[in-house]
Regions:
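Glycine-rich beta-strand-centered segment in the early N-terminal region that forms part
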Residues: 30-46, 56-97
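Residue-level marker of beta-strand positions
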Residues: 71, 88-89, 108, 156, ...
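N-terminal Rossmann-like NAD(P) cofactor-binding module of classical short-chain dehydrogenase/reductase
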Residues: 91, 221-224, 246
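NAD(P)H dinucleotide-binding glycine-rich loop of Rossmann-like/cofactor-binding domains
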Residues: 93-158
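Short, glycine/polar-rich helix-capping loops at beta-to-alpha or helix-loop-helix junctions
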Residues: 105, 186-193, 254-260
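Glycine-rich NAD(P) Rossmann-fold beta1-alpha1 loop
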Residues: 135-136, 161-168, 228
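Adenosine-nucleotide cofactor-binding segment
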Residues: 175-231, 288
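Glycine-rich phosphate-binding loop and adjacent beta-alpha segment
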Residues: 230-295
């Protein structure tokens, strides 16, 4: 028997003809898909993808009506899986949430047990959603670079889109771990905040989006790119030999205009960060680190 009330409030996006109607309304429990864990949602973060899910031209939503929200955190109120007891604090993000399955902008949610992450001690639901999908992706990027051998002594690391959620969190994590981090941003008024997060230097948008040679001077020991096609060509042609960039964004465009030379002459690596489908075991391990050494 469900512990979710027969009706509850949720933000709903409903496609009608060529437009999307959205607003907070009563939603019926029977409209939620099946799942082993029922959660009283306490917090959800707002992501770029959530905005796209509420637009007629967003190309994100796969069902209509849809409760957006690609992440959520809250309290277990019922569970068919012994790993999750009533009253436990948990989170879920990625997979199909807020895309082809109702998401976190709701008072209640029902999800598969295989998507649920127990919150580590010391990390509240609010803390978890302050980090959110963006912070998780940032941590995933830093870990991917370090798993390839990146260390603070190797030299400067570039973060593009540093004013955004992924970029800003990556900047803070890297700086806290002792790296010399340079922040690229299109918002000059953000320099003070980026310096406070730990940026050793600032690059303007023009410096990282202009055309260049197939290979430019080697500069970066590693990079986190949260923008996409607008900045990634610059990053690739300025990475040092053997360096890597962890890429997760497409707000600056999806079509990548580059050459093979960074790959075949300098051996650089382009690491794709897929936080949506990351296996649950690794996902849980990374959230444990976000409560400890990556916090």
């Amino acid at each position: 028997m469900t512990a979710i009330p027969s009706t509850f409030r949720a933000l709903v996006a409903d496609k009608v003809d060529d437009r999307v109607e959205r607003g907070v309304r009563e939603f019926r429990e029977i409209e939620l898909p099946p799942g082993e864990v029922e959660i009283r949602v306490a917090w959800s973060s707002v992501n770029y993808k959530d905005g796209l899910a509420t637009r007629a031209d967003g190309k994100v939503a796969r069902i209509s009506p849809l409760i957006p929200g690609i992440d959520l955190a809250g309290e277990v109120i019922a569970s068919q899986d012994p790993a999750f007891v009533v009253g436990a604090s948990v989170l879920a993000h990625g997979y199909e949430l807020g895309v082809s399955r109702h998401g976190g902008f709701s008072e209640y949610e029902r999800v598969p047990a295989g998507w649920v992450v127990p919150l580590a001690p010391g990390l509240s639901p609010r803390d978890a959603m302050s980090i959110g999908t963006a912070g998780f992706t940032a941590a995933m990027s830093v870990v991917a670079l370090e798993e390839r051998g990146l260390e603070p002594a190797d030299g400067p690391v570039l973060v593009t889109g540093a004013s955004g959620g992924v970029g800003g969190t990556a900047l803070a994590i890297l700086a806290d771990r002792g790296y010399e981090v340079w922040a690229a941003t299109g918002k000059p008024d953000e320099e003070g905040r980026l310096r406070a997060l730990g940026a050793a230097g600032i690059l303007g948008r023009d410096e990282v989006t202009g055309e260049g040679r197939p290979l430019d001077s080697e500069r970066w020991a590693g990079a986190v790119d949260a923008v996409g096609a607008a900045t990634l060509p610059y990053v690739l042609r300025t990475l040092r030999t053997g360096a890597a960039v962890a890429a997760s964004g497409n707000a600056g465009g999806a079509k990548l205009d580059t050459t093979v030379f960074p790959f075949i002459l300098r051996g650089v690596a382009l690491l794709g960060m897929d936080s949506v489908n990351m296996p649950i075991t690794r996902r849980r391990d990374l959230w444990d680190r976000l409560a400890t050494d990556l916090r």
